Amino acid sequence: MLRKEDFEPNMKTEDKIPGAQSENPAQSQRFGDFIVKYMQNVKDTMELFPGTSFQAINEIFGVLYVPLESMGELEVTGTSYNSIPKCYTYMDMEAAGASGITRLHDHPYLKLRGKGTAVAVIDSGIDYQNAVFRNAGGSRIAYLWDQSLEDGTDIAGTEVPYGRLFRKNDIDQALAFEDPFSVVPSRDTNGHGTALAGIAAGNMVPGENFTGAAPEATLIIIKVKPAKQYLRNFYLYPPDAEVFQENDVMMAIAYAISWAKKLEMPLSICLGIGSSQGAHLGTNALSQYVDYVANFSQVSVSVAAGNEGNTRNHSTGIFSQGREQIVRELRVAEREQGFTIEFWGEPPEIYELSIQSPTGEILEVSSSIGSRTQELSFVFVETKVYVNYILIERQTGYSLVYIRFFHPASGIWKIFTQARNRQNVQFHIWLPVEGLISQDTYFLEPSPYTTVTAPGDARNSITATAYQHRDGSIYIAAGRGYTPDGMITPHLAAPGVNVKVPLVRGGFGTRSGTSISAAQTAGIAALLFEWAIIRDNQPFFTGSSVKYYLQRGARREENMQYPNPEWGYGKVDLYHTFELLT
């Protein structure tokens, strides 16, 4: 287990660290990944764990690759929680007109279509053969980085740290072949990335009444590699779960920004993935990184609010004056193999927890032995429960109780919480997001609020929730705000229910979810960049600027208070934004 004070050393990005491998540690199942802020002493950690190597993400964040054999058993401690990569998954389950986009495409003076801007989609890849991503000059994709492909060349000689990179000329060459995959062997195996890229920046297809938000934008596509097996095991995910590591997403953002700079284009990034891990306070490494890059001039990050609003995967409790104990009941499905729970309690309270099995047996969680792992062994059920109690989680100041259930008995489990000092405080409990746990495992007293997934809790992101553009109703599954400390999220609502999307191998279908809303918002951001930067109306536009302009122009109902936890500042309407400017 890594305990070296969260690896916060003193070192520059250009420093070279020894640790050459015969295989790429970023892709190897023999290495564990740890996200670090490396202004302190990474070299000490590398000496502590022989065979360790380092890869910078940017001038603040980097990744340590540590051999699993020298690491010991992975566990959550006060120093390692934020270093262990969280895992993210997909947030999905005639839209363009509802957001004021098509009126701007055809406006006699504006005619905004994303020309001169770049849209990056960081997801499952893309069907690069699809006609909605091609024009008379060939592919509209400038860069396609597939992190999952193995490259047999010298690692140090490639432009990307792992996987394979294909440029527009490679893709154009592939499109001329009878078997394009013999030249560019990158595939979108589930269609999610293709759908998002189409919504954000697909070509106009009048016969299908379809258009992407920014049909003339240049595309940057990153296919994120699957999470390593050791992390999937640690988080107890189902074998078929599609999850991605935080550090790989961060690396994708960093390279997308560098390529946009080479293209000399403003960049709109789309993140249609999310996670319920963390305190929902914007302190996950990915959320912090999104905050950092969205303050850059000419970079915007649009994020899905998540689809956890109706999953019953979140519960909360408030200790008011004189209230001594709160009980939360958890129904566990039959044949549930395992799952994690994160309990986050507001400071300065000290929380005392006990867990009761379906047979009535109660075991206490110790708050006095530090963060080392506690094993709770129940006599009448075969379930093993492992707990780490972190009194002061150092990124937030909150108390974190990290609970892992192995082979949990089906039935009703109870979590008893007491406040030792009886402060007026609140706690939150989150299960994994839908798709990473059985739908029949849920809280009996859930709360739909504070369910926006990370990195939708980042302060500078544009976090998009979803609504039905045909009748104007909110998407029932959409994550709701605010954050535990009252920060406003989501920021905007965009169409995200039964939206027409391009499919892998051609044709069109429909998808729903907040990732769809995030994609449309990313395309809208590209249109704003075209107006502001390409046409020199606001040359120092940042991601935060995009958010503020869209919030100001959002459509709001007269009988509703804004912002609010369901709609944020209202329904995105770019045309109305320009009406206000005039």
Predicted feature residues:
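Beta-sandwich interaction modules
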Residues: 380-421, 427-433
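Autoinhibitory propeptides
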Residues: 1-118, 125-140, 411-413, 442-445, ...
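Short acidic, glycine-rich surface-loop motifs adjacent to enzyme active sites
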Residues: 82-87, 251-281, 304, 420
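Extracellular S/T/G-rich loop segment that most often corresponds to the catalytic His/Ser-adjacent loop
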Residues: 152-155, 160-167, 311-398, 418, ...
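Catalytic cores of secreted or luminal carbohydrate-active enzymes
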Residues: 268-269, 286-321, 572-574, 579
